[in-house]
């Protein structure tokens, strides 16, 4: 794989803003901590407002800084919506696979995302907490069907066990890079409406069922 972690002294070729969205307590902050710092805190408190972390990596010999934004899922923090989505070239829709309601809310979150972000933003559906297989409330097939219908990537993860977390982030970042490098555009190119135009006209391919794991475990790209 050509994805390697970059040197902080390297020139940054691209900055990709990726947002994490979904209900509270689905593990967005834990996913971010696992990817950015390889940490997991059992006592993680609910995010208040907005925070972001960065990680530098190398894709196809280019240095990419991933700027991952995390926000609280509670309704009272929704005032940050416009600024939160502005400039995002990727998004992760996160639900808790042990809580059906968090998955049922994905359509609402996706609608909000598409209402504020570029219409061709790269989106991945994430079913988190797949380490709790005995408590599964969302069959993998339901999530795959939703992802297929909405043209999203899909992966099941465990921030606790670090299952598929790095793979999920690298998949979405590599797809963003592939699109941008193909179009020879920079990450801050805006159209007349102030939306990133990097991803327009791009078809997103989700992982095939052959690449997915069994229903009882964590599903994702191999």
From Swiss-Prot:
Specifically expressed in pollen and localized to the tips of growing pollen tubes. GO terms for biological process: pollen tube development; pollen tube growth; protein transport; regulation of pollen tube growth. It is a lipid-anchor. GTP binds at residues 22-29, 70-74, 128-131, 158-159. Signal peptide: none annotated. One of its GO terms (molecular function) is kinase binding. A lipid is attached at residues 218-219 (S-geranylgeranyl cysteine). Keywords: Cytoplasmic vesicle, GTP-binding, Lipoprotein, Membrane, Nucleotide-binding, Prenylation, Protein transport, Transport. One of its GO terms (cellular component) is exocytic vesicle. InterPro entries: P-loop_NTPase, Rab_GTPases_membrane_traffic, Small_GTP-bd, Small_GTPase. SUPFAM superfamilies: P-loop containing nucleoside triphosphate hydrolases. The keyword Transport applies. It comes from the Eukaryota. Pfam families: Ras. A motif (Effector region) lies at residues 44-52. It is found in: Cytoplasmic vesicle membrane. Disruption phenotype: Defects in pollen tube growth and altered deposition of cell wall components. Interacts with PI4KB1. Belongs to the small GTPase superfamily. Rab family. Intracellular vesicle trafficking and protein transport. Plays an important role in the regulation of pollen tube tip growth. PANTHER family: DRAB11-RELATED. This is Ras-related protein RABA4d. It comes from Arabidopsis thaliana (Mouse-ear cress). The gene is RABA4D.
């Amino acid at each position: 794989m050509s994805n390697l972690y970059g040197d902080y002294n390297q020139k940054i070729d691209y900055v990709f803003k990726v947002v994490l969205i979904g209900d509270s307590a689905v593990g967005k902050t834990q996913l971010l901590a696992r990817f950015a710092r390889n940490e997991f805190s059992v006592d993680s408190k609910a995010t208040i407002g907005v925070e972001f972390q960065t990680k530098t990596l190398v894709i196809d010999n280019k240095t990419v800084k991933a700027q991952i934004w995390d926000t609280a899922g509670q309704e009272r923090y929704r005032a940050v919506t416009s600024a939160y989505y502005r400039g995002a070239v990727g998004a992760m829709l996160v639900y808790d696979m042990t809580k059906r309601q968090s998955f049922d809310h994905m359509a609402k979150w996706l609608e909000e995302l598409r209402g504020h972000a570029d219409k061709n933003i790269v989106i991945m559906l994430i079913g988190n907490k797949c380490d709790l297989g005995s408590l599964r409330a969302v069959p993998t097939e339901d999530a795959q069907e939703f992802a297929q219908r909405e043209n999203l990537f899909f992966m099941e993860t465990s921030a606790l066990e670090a299952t598929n977390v790095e793979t999920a982030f690298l998949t979405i970042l590599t797809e963003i890079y592939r699109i941008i490098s193909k179009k020879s555009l920079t990450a801050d190119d805006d159209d007349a409406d102030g939306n990133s135009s990097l991803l327009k006209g791009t078809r997103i391919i989700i992982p095939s069922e052959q690449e997915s794991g069994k229903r009882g475990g964590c599903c994702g790209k191999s």
